[in-house]
Amino acid sequence: MNLSVKLPGLNLKNPIMPASGCFGFGKEYSEYYDLSLLGGVMMKAATQFERLGNPTPRVAETSAGMLNAIGLQNPGVQQIIDHEVPRLAKYDTSIIANIAGSSIEEYEFVAASFNQTTDVDALELNISCPNVKEGGIQFGTDPFMAKKVTEVVKKASNKPVYVKLSPNVHNIVEMAKAVEEAGADGLSMINTLTGMKIHLPSRKPLIANKTGGLSGPAIKPVAIRMIYEVRQQVSIPIIGMGGITSAEDVLEYLIAGADAVAVGTANFQNPFVCVDIINELPEVLEQYGFNSIEDVIEKRGITV
């Protein structure tokens, strides 16, 4: 069965990618399976200079997901270009670089830096991280700022730009339309929902940042609803994410309006989850009457 999907800058052999922030740069997972099996790899966020991230503890389990406040820890864009991209480029898969910053100028610098390499196929513009004090969410909750940083990154880069949207907004359709008007080639949605968990004996938050981003199965219904709403109002492709653990979840995302998906938290529970989903997808598509991913996309839409 044909699982391929064509998106701006990305010829995916299948629609399955590990989500940025949940897969590092793929080094540990490459010890489990051949990364060439993946439709693509969304690398961990890159900033201009090295970031050490937030104080520990930075991760806490919840009943239906995970809270994290990593804080965009990364070695800096030049280290990523010099060491991580060449290693990933040995695999037959698409590479998407997630870019972040504390200012518009930093976003511009990081986006322009990735022009150094032809091995990066597209950029994912991270304006939705809830766990940093500067940058990130301040751009992702204001349509004017989201549009402005998208325009700057588009001018700085010769690669397609997918803007990662935050669910922590009043109107996500307004955000999606703003970045589409700014020239975004696609959307990634959704990032994590802001949450908190308290240790009862001490009455202290379980993570040092007090609040963190909630991911995992708990947020899937929110993501499906937001993708469905955005799909009715914008025409650019959507890479859907949030609580995907199975091939059935992937089909649900595609029907709601996504064109490809990214798998995040489930990688921590089962390092083979992406490969498992790729293997199970043909049977699930056939079960529900589809003969390819493009067939789902052409026929998608919910019945009422």
From Swiss-Prot:
Its required cofactor(s), as named, are: FMN
Pathway, per record: Pyrimidine metabolism; UMP biosynthesis via de novo pathway; orotate from (S)-dihydroorotate (NAD(+) route): step 1/1
Q: PANTHER family recorded for this chain?
A: DIHYDROOROTATE DEHYDROGENASE (FUMARATE), DIHYDROOROTATE DEHYDROGENASE (QUINONE), MITOCHONDRIAL-RELATED
Question: Which molecular function terms from Gene Ontology are attached?
Answer: dihydroorotate dehydrogenase (NAD+) activity
Query: Where does this protein chiefly localize?
Result: cytoplasm
Q: Where along this sequence does the record place binding of FMN? A: S20, K44, A45, N98, N126, K164, I190, G216, G242, G243, G264, T265
Enzyme Commission designation: 1.3.1.14
Q: Where does substrate bind?
A: K44, N68, A69, I70, G71, L72, N126, N191, T192
The chemistry this enzyme catalyses reads: (S)-dihydroorotate + NAD(+) = orotate + NADH + H(+)
Quaternary arrangement and interactors, per the entry?
Heterotetramer of 2 PyrK and 2 PyrD type B subunits.
Q: Which GO terms describe its biological process?
A: 'de novo' pyrimidine nucleobase biosynthetic process; 'de novo' UMP biosynthetic process
Q: Which organism is it from?
A: Oceanobacillus iheyensis (strain DSM 14371 / CIP 107618 / JCM 11309 / KCTC 3954 / HTE831)
Name of the protein this chain belongs to:
Dihydroorotate dehydrogenase B (NAD(+)), catalytic subunit
**Co-factor binding comment:** Binds 1 FMN per subunit.
Where in the cell does this protein reside? Cytoplasm
